[in-house]
């Protein structure tokens, strides 16, 4: 399979891709299910983003900072030993890693945080709030707020703060105020709810840098477009590496921002398989999991209609994953739509499988992936035996695993 690829993308290319339909809908998913007090802020944000993408000064500044501050473009790395591990007698796929773990702050989250911080400045907002699960979005938001002199408040579940103590310290070191959230399961869902409550109260002075392709319109579109640089670079780098589009793209999915950033520039390239990997926790059959697309039903959470984990009464269920960044009972509406129309595929792997994959990649490639990313690596065990020789697979290495060392050591019985 061959394909003509675009020239090196610029920031202005990121917003050229398709918009959702009226009222921010992807099919039946998406929308704006929020208090009336937030509607003007959402309209202001949508208008500011539309104007910014048309402003050469904005895109030039974003491009400059993506290069000099974030460290883009991130490499497309051929994982030779991992490829050899999955090789069969008749050959097998070749595995490439899109190294988002090499970004400043250690994950893909900085792409969106930087773009939204620039929008906050354009809108005259001096205070920024964010939610975080694994802490990477919180760190990225605290980082850009320090860079631009913005007040930063981060909401984080108390359980996630325990699991991600290193990132909590990093946020505070960067000048952010980190509020522990003890309600509910004290994880990402509850942190998001608290951030929205803050925004409702302080909407005139505050911009909410939502960290995933979830929430009310325009956030799923906005976050996707700031992360689409991942897929744009991947297209160009694949041409340079092997002269055509990849056959398979893979990424972990919680809310789904890293996956959507990789997938979106390829959505219309129907010969390219798009595979998202969710967290099966203790196993989907146990009920202790975060496999929203695999097991969810349509509902409304945090301002958008999407697939959700729900009980028989329609109440949102608790999610479970060893990975704080995937421990969420919802998913971005565009992922729900891509699954419904058959454009993307989704699987799920357990905590134990993710731990095994993390160790395997660490020992074969000298790269310690985040626990979130390890879920995508774990799916290679299922996928690779089904692929023909010469298949080109690109996996989004969405973050590094420094933040997870204590959790992994504890689970492996080698507590630090």
UniProtKB/Swiss-Prot annotation:
GO terms for cellular component: cytoplasm. It holds the Pfam family PALP. It comes from the Bacteria. Its EC number is 4.2.1.20. Keywords: Amino-acid biosynthesis, Aromatic amino acid biosynthesis, Lyase, Pyridoxal phosphate, Tryptophan biosynthesis. It catalyses: (1S,2R)-1-C-(indol-3-yl)glycerol 3-phosphate + L-serine = D-glyceraldehyde 3-phosphate + L-tryptophan + H2O. The modification N6-(pyridoxal phosphate)lysine is found at residue 109. It is an enzyme of class 4 (lyase). The keyword Membrane does not apply. One of its GO terms (molecular function) is tryptophan synthase activity. The beta subunit is responsible for the synthesis of L-tryptophan from indole and L-serine. Belongs to the TrpB family. Tetramer of two alpha and two beta chains. This is Tryptophan synthase beta chain. It comes from Synechococcus sp. (strain WH7803). The gene is trpB.
